Amino acid sequence: RTLHGLVLSQWRVTDVADYLQRVARWVPSIHSWSVCDIFSFSGGKRWVAAHEVEVWSFLLPYFSAQRTYEIRFAVVMGLQYFAKQSHLAPFLAQLAAITHEDYYVRMAVAWAVAECFTHCPEDTQAWLAQNLLPAWTHNKAIQKIRESYRIDAETKRELLLLKRPVEKSK
């Protein structure tokens, strides 16, 4: 699985549709966060930028998948390639729509929000203030942002005000 993902990450792409089909056949075999997170699209950010519409369309169904690592795949690919101003609103909307309760999905969403914050702090902070995420994921995103060395002390203090109470499980 890992090797397959690594091979796909280095694949010489001559046909976008064929390549995305190969990736789609691999995605169901993802069984851990490490296999998921090691993958990147062949050609990296430059390739994705050249095929942004196709790649975004390819990822969209995975955001609403039922399987943990299919959702995590969409979120991790999103944070790698779409956590930027030009795609911020649709990416954050996809993150807010995720209702899957698995730890690895929730952590990926928190990580993605933190990554969005580093690239677009004002817009992401305003989005966080809308409380669109479940409380645990919302607070974990704030924690991850505050742990970053790229965020100044004043912003870290402001973010504390956005934390929400989380119900303890019985």
Where in this protein do the model-derived segments appear?
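Alpha-helical scaffold domains
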Residues: 1-170
